């Protein structure tokens, strides 16, 4: 039987059984589960496929020998030698100092060998040093070639050839060949050959170049020259022009009189030695013309010839300072990396986050509980016992987080030791195999291969190293919910192990589903403290290196501030708008000015809104003027009302006269006799004129407002109430001009007969507020404004109008599709229109009759 792992693979059985290939269930062609949907499509043909890591058998089983340690030692030695030769640090400089002294000694002896007095004494020592140098350099060269294999790009024979083609390796092989040639020629005793090959000894000067294996000095020089290349080219170019011009003019002046300037080449030599401030004195001008020209060009040319030295010096100084600053900045890498790591763990160990598991898995693998191994008397095996000072802690862990402790016999005793969580996980019933069912003496403990090897070597030591498979199994064991599911599952054994069922009689396992809350809180506290410490260390590493560093930080901050201000200014310009100023020259001189394009800025939009509000205000003024004209309100009183902005009046006061008028209103009702003429027009009988003393007219609109009461829509504080037309001005006396008929109408209007009933006044809204107008009424007219009054109120008003002007046509309602402005009265401009008949004192107010 085999056990399927989480990834769908299987562990191979014993050597006696059929070996199963590790793979995914349902993906192998011809497998029992290959009939699943999509399995054949994924598997493809049965041709041999490329092997993967899952297909490789597990190495280092119980029957296998020790893993070869030569590979690890081989790689370690390669890395060590490569670092010593190519990247020396610390005590590795001792070897390079020894090589430098050896090369320098050979160079000094080569110099002394050219002197006749020291030739014989220096040749013997030089011969010995040459042999030592050749041996050292030869061995070092081959070691370099071999150690370069630690780098991935230099592995294999092609990689070695690539490493051998490096410039410094080429110099090494050239010096080695030259040294061997010189040594071979000197050992033959041939005088001619020795004198001819003696010059090859100076090839040993190239050995000094190899002292700088990494080429730091050459890189520094190249970076300085490249950084100041423009300045150097300018100085050299102008200096070269001065050299040519000065040499040519001095040559022309000294050609016939001075033998030192016979050719132009002599003049160039003189100019170069003079402008470079060397001045050998072998050539000099003798005529006064030549001396004057030489002095003039010397003052100009020397300054340009000296410029490259200053440029290179300052460049070297700046570059070295920059390198020191860069090294100082590199010291911030470790604190920054530690801060990032601690910040992530501080974030990931938040107890409220339930979606982050990797950090907790790290602590699950690293947390250990010390245990004591003691030998049992029954089976002669050892079991894990916690120390006395940790019994209470383990009891609490067991009670809080479901930790399970069970006894298990161990195959061999061991002294007191600190057992890691991995050992306790693998000393589980999953690792217990018995030859006979129910026989505890035959039980064995399954361990990892590394543990078996270490126990064979030294039984008293605890196995510390465990393979990747053991770690994966440990992570799986951490998440096992209970023992029942583990006992029912099938077991898988490594090669060389017996496959048996679990022994349920004697089990011992330390299994935890998750860390305890208390342990999590402790880990959280440690992460917080580490984060604070890392933050403090990183802040300490951010201290400025020098004054230039401070200035650089301030300049960088200033540039950042300027960029932010520029961005803010652009956004402000986009919002406010910054249009180009239009001058008189740019204006088009024409009869009609062209419309300017709309400004997309916020200020342009606000201006457009203001224009629309102004247009709406004009329309409202126009509608209010129509209302005042229709209701007969004088403009002076309306302006006084809106200008004063008086508060709402008190509740209406009912005077005794109003009560008496209310009591006598039924006696003053005038019966209106309607008759129809042959043309179909209505004729109204005029009521008798009542004396004005019986019903005194009102003198102000406040009294009229008090008499009418409150509006049906309510007196809300946010509504602007338009005053009702006064009783003595409803006939529009401003248009009639004080006629006698208007005076009679005012008298008639003051009578109770002409006064509308209280119910009509209550139902109608004579005191009209603008928000009380219904939307349906607004849609009836083209002007968007209409006034609704009850039919009874309009009939009563019509009777009063008929008393004075019987021929006037009264239109109490407005037909659909017709607006208030359709009548001649509502014309906003021009003189007041006449009536249809043009007669009567109220012709100005009467509406025109229907058109025939």
UniProtKB/Swiss-Prot annotation:
Q: Which residues lie within the membrane without crossing it?
A: 264-276
After translation, how is this protein modified?
Answer: KCNQ2/KCNQ3 heteromeric current can be increased by intracellular cyclic AMP, an effect that depends on phosphorylation of Ser-52 in the N-terminal region.
Keywords from the UniProt entry: Cell membrane, Ion channel, Ion transport, Membrane, Phosphoprotein, Potassium, Potassium channel, Potassium transport, Transmembrane, Transmembrane helix, Transport, Ubl conjugation, Voltage-gated channel
Substituting residue 527 to R results in: No loss of calmodulin binding in the presence of Ca(2+) compared to WT. No difference with WT in current suppression in the presence of Ca(2+)
For molecular function, the Gene Ontology terms on record are: ankyrin binding; calmodulin binding; potassium channel activity; voltage-gated monoatomic cation channel activity; voltage-gated monoatomic ion channel activity; voltage-gated potassium channel activity
* Annotated localization: Cell membrane
Cytoplasmic face: residue ranges? 1-90, 146-163, 216-227, 315-852
Q: Where is this region: Disordered?
A: 404-469, 579-601, 643-662, 672-718, 818-852
Motif window: Selectivity filter: 277-282
Q: Where does a 1,2-diacyl-sn-glycero-3-phospho-(1D-myo-inositol-4,5-bisphosphate) bind?
A: 214, 230, 327
Note whether Cell membrane occurs among the keywords. yes
Extract the InterPro entries matched here. Ankyrin-G_BS, Ion_trans_dom, K_chnl_volt-dep_KCNQ, K_chnl_volt-dep_KCNQ2, K_chnl_volt-dep_KCNQ_C
Q: In this chain, where does the modification Phosphoserine occur?
A: 52, 448, 450, 454, 458, 460, 489, 655, 781, 783
Subunit and partners: Heterotetramer with KCNQ3; forms heterotetrameric M-channel responsible for the M-current. Homotetrameric; forms a functional homotetrameric channel resulting in the expression of a small M-current. Interacts with calmodulin; the interaction is calcium-independent, constitutive and participates in the proper assembly of a functional M-channel. May associate with KCNE2. Interacts with IQCJ-SCHIP1. Interacts (via the pore module) with SLC5A3/SMIT1; forms a coregulatory complex that alters ion selectivity, voltage dependence and gating kinetics of the channel.
In the record's own words, the domains note is: Each subunit contains six transmembrane segments (S1-S6) with S1-S4 forming one voltage sensing domain (VSD) and S5-S6 contributing to form one quarter of an interlocking pore-forming domain (PD).
Protein name in UniProt: Potassium voltage-gated channel subfamily KQT member 2
Q: Name its species.
A: Rattus norvegicus
């Amino acid at each position: 039987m085999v056990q399927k792992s989480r990834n769908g693979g299987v562990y191979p059985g014993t050597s006696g059984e059929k070996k199963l290939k590790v793979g995914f269930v349902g993906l192998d062609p011809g497998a029992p589960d290959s009939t699943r949907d999509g399995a054949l499509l994924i598997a493809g043909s049965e041709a041999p496929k490329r092997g993967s890591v899952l297909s490789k058998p597990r190495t280092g089983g119980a029957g296998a020998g020790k893993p070869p340690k030569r590979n690890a030692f081989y790689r370690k030695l390669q890395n060590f030698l490569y670092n010593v030769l190519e990247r020396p640090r610390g005590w590795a400089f001792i070897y390079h100092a020894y090589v430098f002294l050896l090369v320098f000694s050979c160079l000094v002896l080569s110099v002394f060998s050219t002197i006749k007095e020291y030739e014989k004494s220096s040749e013997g020592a030089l011969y010995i040093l040459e042999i030592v140098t050749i041996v050292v350099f030869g061995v070092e060269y081959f070691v370099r070639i071999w150690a370069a294999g630690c780098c991935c790009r230099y592995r294999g024979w092609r990689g070695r050839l690539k490493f051998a083609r490096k410039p410094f390796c080429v110099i090494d092989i050239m010096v080695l060949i030259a040294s061997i040639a010189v040594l071979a020629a000197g050992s033959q005793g041939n005088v001619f050959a020795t004198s001819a090959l003696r010059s090859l000894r100076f090839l040993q000067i190239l050995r000094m170049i190899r002292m700088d294996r990494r080429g730091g000095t050459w890189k520094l020089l190249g970076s300085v020259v490249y950084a100041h290349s423009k300045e150097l080219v300018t100085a050299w170019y102008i200096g070269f022009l001065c050299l040519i011009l000065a040499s040519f003019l001095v040559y022309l002046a000294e050609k016939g009189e001075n033998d030192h300037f016979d050719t132009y080449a002599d003049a160039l030599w003189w100019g170069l030695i003079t402008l470079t401030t060397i001045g050998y004195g072998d050539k000099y001008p003798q005529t006064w013309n030549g001396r004057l020209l030489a002095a003039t060009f010397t003052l100009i040319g020397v300054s340009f010839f000296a410029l490259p030295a200053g440029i290179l010096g300052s460049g070297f100084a700046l570059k070295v300072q920059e390198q020191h600053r860069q090294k100082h900045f590199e010291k911030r890498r470790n604190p920054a990396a530690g801060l990032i790591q601690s910040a992530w763990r501080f974030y990931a160990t938040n107890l409220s986050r339930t979606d982050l598991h990797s950090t907790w898995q790290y602590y699950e693998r690293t947390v250990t509980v010390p245990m004591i191994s003691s030998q049992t008397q029954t089976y002669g095996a050892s079991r894990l016992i916690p120390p006395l000072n940790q019994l209470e802690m383990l009891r609490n862990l067991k009670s809080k987080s479901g930790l399970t402790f069970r006894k298990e016999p161990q195959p061999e005793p061991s002294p007191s030791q600190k057992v890691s969580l991995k050992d306790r996980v693998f000393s589980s019933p999953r690792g217990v195999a018995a030859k006979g069912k129910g026989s505890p003496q035959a039980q064995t403990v399954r361990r990892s291969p590394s543990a078996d090897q270490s126990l064979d070597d030294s039984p008293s030591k605890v196995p510390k190293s465990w393979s990747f498979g053991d770690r994966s199994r440990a992570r799986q064991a951490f998440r096992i919910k209970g023992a029942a599911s583990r006992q029912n599952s099938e077991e898988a054994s490594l090669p060389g192990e017996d496959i048996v069922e679990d022994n349920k009689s004697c089990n011992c396992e330390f299994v935890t589903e998750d860390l305890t809350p208390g342990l999590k809180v402790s880990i959280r506290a440690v992460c917080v403290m580490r984060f604070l410490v890392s933050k403090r260390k990183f802040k300490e590493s951010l201290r400025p290196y020098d004054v230039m560093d401070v200035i650089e930080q301030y300049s960088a901050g200033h540039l950042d501030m300027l960029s932010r201000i520029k961005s803010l200014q652009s956004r402000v310009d986009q919002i406010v708008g910054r249009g180009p100023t239009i001058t008189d020259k740019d204006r088009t001189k024409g009869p009609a000015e062209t419309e300017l394009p709309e400004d997309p800025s916020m200020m342009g939009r606000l201006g457009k809104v203001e224009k629309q509000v102004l247009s709406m205000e004009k329309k409202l003024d126009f509608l209010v003027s129509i209302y005042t004209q229709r209701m007969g309100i004088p403009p002076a009183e309306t302006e006084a009302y809106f200008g004063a902005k008086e508060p709402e009046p008190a509740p209406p006061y009912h005077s005794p006269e109003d009560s008496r008028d209310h009591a006598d209103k039924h006696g003053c009702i005038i019966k209106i006799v309607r008759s129809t003429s042959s043309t179909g027009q209505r004729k109204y009988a005029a009521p008798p004129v009542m004396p004005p003393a019986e019903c005194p007219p009102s003198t102000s609109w406040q009294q009229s407002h008090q008499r009418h009461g409150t509006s049906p829509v309510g007196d809300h504080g946010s509504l602007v109430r338009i005053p009702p037309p006064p009783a003595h001005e409803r006939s529009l006396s401003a248009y009639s001009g004080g006629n006698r008929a208007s005076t009679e109408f005012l008298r008639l209007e003051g009578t109770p007969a002409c006064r509308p009933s209280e119910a009509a006044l209550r139902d109608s809204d004579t005191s009209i507020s603008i928000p009380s107008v219904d939307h349906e009424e607004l849609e009836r007219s083209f002007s968007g404004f209409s006034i609704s009054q009850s039919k009874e109120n309009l009939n009563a008003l019509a009777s009063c109008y008929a008393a004075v002007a019987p021929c006037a046509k009264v239109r109490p309602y407005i037909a659909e599709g017709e607006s208030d402005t359709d009548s001649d009265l509502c014309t906003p401009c021009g003189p007041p229109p006449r009536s249809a008949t043009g007669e009567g004192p109220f012709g100005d107010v009467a509406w025109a009759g229907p058109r025939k």
